[in-house]
Each structure stands twice: as C-alpha cells, then as structure tokens.
C-alpha cells in the first residue's frame, strides 16, 4: 500500500491533499496489518509446532507478543516514516532513528531486568508507539503548516 502511494504523495503539491491521502493510507495499512496480526497470533501455535516442533510450544505466547509489537511498527510508524522522504523531508527520519535506537536500548535494558524476556517486547512496543506518534505529529505539521 505504502509503495503504491509513495509516488502519488511525491507528486502531490497541496499539503492538505497529501495529509488526507496519508490518513487514508494509514487507516488502510493499520486495517490490513491488524488482520494479518490476528491471523499470525491465532496461527502461532501451529506455525511453531510445524517449523520448530512441539519442543518449542512454550514460545507461543512470546510469538504472539511479537506479532502485536511488529503490528504497532507497521500500523503506526511506517506510513509517516516512509512518506516524509516523499515530501522532501528525510533528515527527520535519521534523527528519529538515532533517538529511537538509543531509547530502545535504554528501555530494553531496564525492561528485561524487570520482566525478563517479556521486557524486550514491552520496550519495543513502547518505543514503536511513542516514535509513531511523534512521526505522525511531525508529518502532519509538515503537510499542513510548512
């Protein structure tokens, strides 16, 4: 979805139009990712059993957490992160990548010490949601006010 709309966004000159298209793409992407995530979470026990064997069935819950975490990334962050370069703003992505990486490292360290392996999922999900909100706020500002 994002790849198809990238060129449309890049060619559009009206910021309000870009914003409106982007909101629709964001909702479509979140919907598709939501469906895939539910399917992945439901099928995780079978996937793990088929691919790794019954010996690893205890990883099913953790697998489900990571389906959700990566859905947060794809459903919240990916649209503005990919559309910013389409409107000529790429530096922000580099800055956000560095900040997200540092924040992720710090939060993961403390989350794992508190929650064990589950802390990795919690920290990753937290960073994805927070950075995703920052991306959308900045993207909106660039579309509507610059």
What are these regions (language model features)?
Residues 8, 33-38, 67-74, 97-101, ...:
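Residue-level hotspots within the lipid-embedded alpha helices of multi-pass solute transporters
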Residues 42-71:
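Interfacial segments at transmembrane-helix termini and the short loops linking adjacent helices
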Residues 128-144:
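Multi-pass alpha-helical transporter architecture, strongest
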Residues 44-49, 99-133:
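Membrane-interface helix-loop junctions in multi-pass transport and translocation proteins
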Residues 13, 51, 87-89, 115:
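Membrane-helix interface residues
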Residues 1-15, 80-86:
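Helix-loop junctions and terminal segments of transmembrane helices
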Residues 19-29, 63, 82-106, 118-121, ...:
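Alpha-helical transmembrane segments of multi-pass membrane transporters/permeases
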């Amino acid at each position: 979805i994002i790849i198809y709309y990238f060129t449309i966004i890049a060619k559009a000159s009206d910021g309000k139009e870009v914003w409106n298209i982007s909101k629709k793409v964001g909702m479509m992407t979140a919907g598709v990712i939501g469906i895939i995530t539910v399917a992945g979470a439901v099928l995780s026990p079978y996937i793990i059993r088929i691919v790794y064997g019954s010996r690893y069935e205890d990883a099913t819950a953790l697998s489900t957490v990571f389906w959700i975490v990566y859905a947060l990334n794809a459903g919240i962050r990916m649209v503005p992160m990919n559309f910013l370069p389409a409107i000529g703003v790429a530096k922000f992505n580099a800055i956000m990548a560095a900040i997200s990486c540092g924040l992720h490292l710090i939060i993961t360290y403390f989350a794992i010490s508190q929650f064990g392996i589950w802390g990795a999922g919690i920290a990753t999900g937290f960073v994805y949601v927070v950075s995703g909100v920052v991306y959308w706020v900045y993207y909106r500002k660039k579309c509507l006010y610059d």
